[in-house]
Amino acid sequence: MSTLTPAYDNKIYQKYSKKMLQNKEKNKISFCQDFGLNYDKRIPLLCLTFPLTEKNNLGILQDIIQGILEQDVMLAVTGIGTEKYQNFFNELAKEHPKRISIVSDNDGNKRKIYAASDIFLATAATEECKEEIEKAMNYGVIPICPANELVADYDGAREEGNAFVYKENSPWSFFASLIRAMENFKFPYDWRTIQQSAMSEPEDEKESDEE
């Protein structure tokens, strides 16, 4: 069975593909309306959909979150995990209700997040993180992540790559890769090239989720 793609996903707001990436933005608009975020095309929607646990190195994000929130960003989180991290993100959402949304962790909501989001925050290369990275990339969401077999660090000179890889396990290395991604996000043509590199869209197997 091939991986479900946004071209054939009935759970998202608007289907889209590599060739129709402009329709991805319609998902962002609808998601922001449904989950209380202030939509702005110029502001990237970041997402985090893997379990909020120590194993997934959430401390690296916790250490740098204030620096991230000083940027023009929005954040969608599926808030399931250890109590410490659930409380951390719940408090952030209370402080920034129009910028941060805690979303119920189910498959339909996750796929809406993938369809709406621009950047995926991956704090580890555990199997459960890599599983979410792969799904998100298939929806044109660009990961900030440690090096792993799924990704190639973006090279702007060659216009190659599908992720922004941080090479040191430190908050500042993570933050530098995020800033690099956000700078590229300002250039729609370049960003679309990265998205198309990330997306896998089998043309010969059209699957539709009718659930």
Predicted feature locations:
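Catalytic cores of carbohydrate-active enzymes across secretory and cytosolic contexts
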Residues: M1-E211
